[in-house]
Amino acid sequence: MAARLRRKVILGLGAVAVVPVLAAASPGAAGAAAAAGTSCSTAGTWQRGELNVYWLDVEQGDAQLVVGPTGKTLLVDLGETAWNSTGANTNATRIAQRIRSICGVSGAVHLDYVMASHHHLDHIGYAANPNDTSTVGNGLYRLLAPTGENFSVGTLLDRDGGTWTDANRDGDCDVGTSADPSNEIAWHNAGTTSQTARRWICWLYGPAAQPDRANIAGRVVRLTNSSPWPSLDLGAGVTATIVQANAKNVMEADGVTLVSGDHTTEAVPPSENDYSIGLKITYGKFEYATAGDTDGEYATSSFGYTYNDVEASLLGPFGNVETLRANHHGSTHSSNSTYVKTLAPESAFISCGSNSYGHPGNRVLDALRQVVNERGAGADIYLANNPCDLAQADGTTPTNYVGTLNANGDVHLRTTQTGLGYVIDYDTGSRTYTAYDEGSGGSGDPSQVRINEYLMAPNASGPNEWVELYNPTTQTVTVGGLYIDDVAGGGGAPKQIPAGTTIGPGGHWVFEFPSGFLNNTGTESVRYLAISGGETVYDSHSYSLGSTQYDKVFHRIGSGGAWCNTISTNVTKGAANPASCP
């Protein structure tokens, strides 16, 4: 039978919705043609009764295996470094054997869930197609195809990139070539496209009777923007919630155009990375965040596509976490300072291998080293390989690997005491951590949080206005559900801070919203307040401008100091302000 749905209420992207809980289907339940792999058993190396996260070394790519406390499994991605690798030379073959060892299974393994974060080779591999004249097929395709490793799957989760249309009515899904791609894909949420994506979509959504679809037919769940996304059943006590896909509700740099939708014919479309799936997993007090190659800035690549700040949409749903998998292999286009400071992890993993992209970026490494978290300052940084790239993207500046952990191979995280703590095992040892109560909110006083900086007239800096809050206390403070407003009794409607948002001790958090809320000229106020019947104003600042001052801010001295009365070009969004006024 198909995957079973239960229902519960969760909070995602700032709105309450009733969403399905996607229960794992049993092996072979979708039909006799499907392989009946064996589920994880107690004979494996995974830690029973705890949450296990395996970051699997696939060099410059991604693969994660999550094993729940009762043995339920989720594989997120299985990337390859070459489109034409086959057989024993693939990551798929090697990772299949690794999964067998973890699960204690000698043959084909049944995976409860498989998730493709987005449609790039280094995350999903390269699918074969019935029209191929030579042997190809690796990554997730080889893992699940009957002619490959023949693993079975309960539910295969895919972002809504597009579907097959059979434009030429020949009954199969044609991909064409890179030089002359077919027109058989109806793109839904896409910018840059590739043969990797076309082949993936043809495999997932092609003819039901196509032989290589036997193990996935009837098991694919496409995450559309029109329906609530499911949470996953990884066993009692585990919450696994999809919080982003397809760049839902994210605007491009103009502040008007949605990143979602079909942008494939545009001259400079969004990057495929922007459409990555974001997933949060919680067990006890332990919280983990992973989001594919999600971007965290507005910029245009020299390769003809745009980066968009999708990370801003994850701040509220993710909140403060114990462990973060850095987005996009530690790229400087991702894991921006606000994102790292808001999530405030105690540990982080970067999946990278030999590359020429400057991964990981020194800015990301420094942000993780300096982040203020529940145990003080600094997150432990684990790498799949060390070194990955020897230099930064400029080809000259050395990558600073000082203090990073794990030189080569898989890294295993396992919770302890049903989520009260966790241990990370790496190539030369292990480290033990305490899990904190971020998921239930901070214990600090929200009235002590201060407005620290704000920008009212964006232009070249991006599409959004923003207000930065600063937590001067030594405790995590929950600000979710509170408001940012302008003038009392007038102006625009108050902006509610997404539920679950917390600010760590000494931390900064930036609330972004589309331009048009704060006045560019005249007299205006910025207020941070609670609204419950009446208003309780915790902090406010007023200004008066005779003309629009684009890309300038009002800020305090340092963090939480006196206000500067002169507008400033020293924009320090998400970080400490200058030590003096302009």
Residue ranges of each PLM-predicted region?
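Secretory targeting and sorting signals
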Residues: 2-33
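Flexible, acidic/histidine-containing loops and adjacent segments that form or flank the divalent-metal
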Residues: 36-52, 58, 98, 107-108, ...
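Structural recognition of the beta-strand scaffold that forms the well-ordered cores
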Residues: 53-55, 63-67, 73-77, 110-117, ...
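Solvent-exposed loop/turn segments at secondary-structure junctions
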Residues: 59-63, 72, 80-83, 119-124, ...
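Active-site metal-binding motif and surrounding structural segment of the metallo-beta-lactamase
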Residues: 69-74, 79-157, 313-331, 344-349
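Extracytoplasmic/secreted cell-surface and envelope-processing proteins
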Residues: 84-86, 121-129, 133-136, 164-169, ...
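Internal alpha/beta domain cores that form substrate/cofactor-binding pockets in large enzymes
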Residues: 321-392
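Intrinsically disordered, low-complexity linkers and terminal tails enriched in Ser/Thr/Pro/Gly
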Residues: 442-582
